[in-house]
């Protein structure tokens, strides 16, 4: 028995060595020792994967390798190699790794989890639909929804307290923008007034992100017989019960001569496409991507911005003064669609607010909403950063490390918006780069500008305990969120 055990240990050690040695000779990136079945996943601390990968980056450099279970994986950790891969060599890294959980969520018909040819078609249709609907709806929609949020917060200040956990309200604000943009509908801010099916969808979307971040059987194949995707399927079914009837109703009642929202334009584009690559059934999966991704990324960025500017009140005051300087401060904002347009900045005036734009960039750099990019598949042998990436390798962009790299950013853990006002601002890859850059990038940036300038002109945010800074260490799900904190909200005079 002991002899057999020694033979097994020797064979495993020999396989690991041969695997490592052959790849080293072929210019394969360095990395930690991979164990049978699990590869290098033992190096990743649950809930702190971004920090674990950052430690490996510090040890092995800007391009390193490890196995995710049975998948050969290369991690890209600095902006230059991420750009080199996804922008300069985009054709080699256009495809996705199609993990089992991705198929459960998107049925190979959504935006994020599809292969190149399907994705190109869906991206083209989305771009046309986004452009047509955006032109007609965007700024008015932002203003209308912000003022609903504004009145709710003011009501809370009068009737309850000037301290609050603001995260759920920011999520409602962000959700309402995407929901209204898609369906021309909104939801209330009070839990007790939200229809039960919508509230269940919101809860299910939060559960989805948690479950997707804890799916080891995606990579460790021996676990698949024991860890079914039952929970994930249940969550997706709950979300489908909310989305599908609304999409079906839009299809049934569509007025081709008077499209009113993004879904209307999307239906028209799909029907007019001669290739019929994208089916009407795909709309529910596209909507799921936009609702879940669009809600969490924007609300998380706003919450981080409140946290950082509460820890750096002098910057918040300078930001307030910049907004006041460029807008009319002799009038009071109203809460109707015909609000006083001179009181708040317009989207076309973005360039007049360099400090605000720098605060947004610094917030997204310091705490990127999605710290790890969705996995790509290398479709042909390609050299990146001086290393050979073999065909079939999984590629992951470590956006967290690339955004907090001391080679690119001086004092990267310090919140310093001024770094983006300098003559040669550093390069960022918050939304990744290349053809498969986040499709909601421009919409998210417009939301952050429109909401943020109004928010920080109307309210002052501060810490209830002046002697204690907010913790700037993040919690990782699929998105990077701050630890829950209570903020003090004061109405600006």
From Swiss-Prot:
<feature type="transmembrane region" description="Helical">
    <location>
        <begin position="1"/>
        <end position="21"/>
    </location>
</feature>
<dbReference type="Pfam" id="PF00067">
    <property type="entry name" value="p450"/>
</dbReference>
<dbReference type="GO" id="GO:0020037">
    <property type="term" value="F:heme binding"/>
</dbReference>
<keyword id="KW-0812">Transmembrane</keyword>
<keyword id="KW-0503">Monooxygenase</keyword>
<keyword id="KW-1133">Transmembrane helix</keyword>
<feature type="binding site" description="axial binding residue">
    <location>
        <position position="438"/>
    </location>
    <ligand>
        <name>heme</name>
    </ligand>
</feature>
<dbReference type="GO" id="GO:0006805">
    <property type="term" value="P:xenobiotic metabolic process"/>
</dbReference>
<dbReference type="InterPro" id="IPR001128">
    <property type="entry name" value="Cyt_P450"/>
</dbReference>
<dbReference type="GO" id="GO:0005506">
    <property type="term" value="F:iron ion binding"/>
</dbReference>
<dbReference type="GO" id="GO:0005737">
    <property type="term" value="C:cytoplasm"/>
</dbReference>
<keyword id="KW-0349">Heme</keyword>
<dbReference type="GO" id="GO:0016712">
    <property type="term" value="F:oxidoreductase activity, acting on paired donors, with incorporation or reduction of molecular oxygen, reduced flavin or flavoprotein as one donor, and incorporation of one atom of oxygen"/>
</dbReference>
<comment type="similarity">
    <text>Belongs to the cytochrome P450 family.</text>
</comment>
<dbReference type="InterPro" id="IPR036396">
    <property type="entry name" value="Cyt_P450_sf"/>
</dbReference>
<dbReference type="InterPro" id="IPR002401">
    <property type="entry name" value="Cyt_P450_E_grp-I"/>
</dbReference>
<keyword id="KW-0408">Iron</keyword>
<dbReference type="GO" id="GO:0043231">
    <property type="term" value="C:intracellular membrane-bounded organelle"/>
</dbReference>
<dbReference type="GO" id="GO:0006082">
    <property type="term" value="P:organic acid metabolic process"/>
</dbReference>
<keyword id="KW-0472">Membrane</keyword>
<keyword id="KW-0560">Oxidoreductase</keyword>
<keyword id="KW-0479">Metal-binding</keyword>
<dbReference type="GO" id="GO:0016020">
    <property type="term" value="C:membrane"/>
</dbReference>
<protein>
    <recommendedName>
        <fullName>Probable cytochrome P450 515B1</fullName>
        <ecNumber>1.14.-.-</ecNumber>
    </recommendedName>
</protein>
<dbReference type="InterPro" id="IPR017972">
    <property type="entry name" value="Cyt_P450_CS"/>
</dbReference>
